[in-house]
Amino acid sequence: MLILLTNDDGIASPGLQALKDALKERHDVVTLAPVKDMSGTAHAISRGEDIKLTRIAEYEVAINGTPTDCVMAGLRMVLRRPPDLLVSGINMGANVAEDLSYSATAGAAWEGALSGIPSMAVSLCGSAAPWHFESAIKVTHMVIRQWLENPLPPGTFLNVNVPNVPEYELKNPKPTRQGLRFNWPPPPVTAAGNPAFWDPTIPTPREEEFQLATDEEALRDGFTSVTALHCLFRHPHATERLKAWSLFR
C-alpha cells in the first residue's frame, strides 16, 4: 500500500520520523512535510509565495509551506499515482474538540479527504517527554487494518488521539464525537474599562449531554479517541429545517 505521510510539527519532528520508520516496514511511504513547525495553521495554503521542494532523502521531501501545501504538492507534483492512504502525524500534543479548527495536523488530513484519499490525523496526547511514539504507532497500524477491512464512506477522515502512555498501558480505542470543550471566560478589564489581556489557555468546562463520548472525555478516561469527520461543511439536519423558512417560499 502506498502511504503519503505528512505532519505540522516539521520534517525533523521525532514523531514524524518514528511513524515513517514504522510504516515503511509494511508499506511504501512517501513523506512530504514542512521545513519548520507549522502548528496552528489549520487548512491554510501559501498564497503569493514560491513553494520550494527540497529532497532530504529518497522518498522524503521538505517544503517551505503549510501541511496542506505538502498534501497538494504530493498529490499533484510528486506522486505518480494517488496514494491509498494519507497519514498526518504523529503530532506531539492533543487535537481534540475545537482544537480541530486550528490544527494543521487535522488540516492535512482534511485536504486528503477533499482529494478523495482516505486520510487520518494521529496525535499523541501529552505535553512533555517521554513521548511514547510506540503507542501511537500501534494504534495507527490497528486503524489502518480496520479501515482496509471495513472502508468508510468517501470524504471521511479520522482524527485519532492516543494517550501518551507506554504501549502496555493502552486501552481499547473508542469511537467518539468531536467535543466542545470550553466556555471562554471574559478577560479582566482595567479601571478604564479596557480588556487587560486575553489568555486562551484558561478555559472553563462546558457540560454536554450526548450518547457518544467526546474525544476529550475518552482521553480523560485513558482511552484512545477515534473520531470520524467529513471534509465538507454540511449539516443535513439543519438543511432540512432551513427548507422550512418562509424566506424560501
Swiss-Prot record:
Protein name, please? 5'-nucleotidase SurE
Q: What class of enzyme is it?
A: hydrolase
Question: What note does UniProt attach to the cofactor annotation?
Answer: Binds 1 divalent metal cation per subunit.
Q: Which residues form a coiled coil?
A: none
Tell me any Pfam family this protein matches.
SurE
- Keyword Metal-binding belongs to the record: yes
Q: Which organism is it from?
A: Magnetococcus marinus (strain ATCC BAA-1437 / JCM 17883 / MC-1)
Cofactors, names only = a divalent metal cation
Positions of a divalent metal cation binding? D8, D9, S39, N91
Which keywords has UniProt assigned to this entry?
Answer: Cytoplasm, Hydrolase, Metal-binding, Nucleotide-binding
- Care to name a GO molecular-function term for this sequence? 3'-nucleotidase activity
Question: Which cellular component, as a GO term, is one annotated location?
Answer: cytoplasm
Q: What's the domain of life for this entry?
A: Bacteria
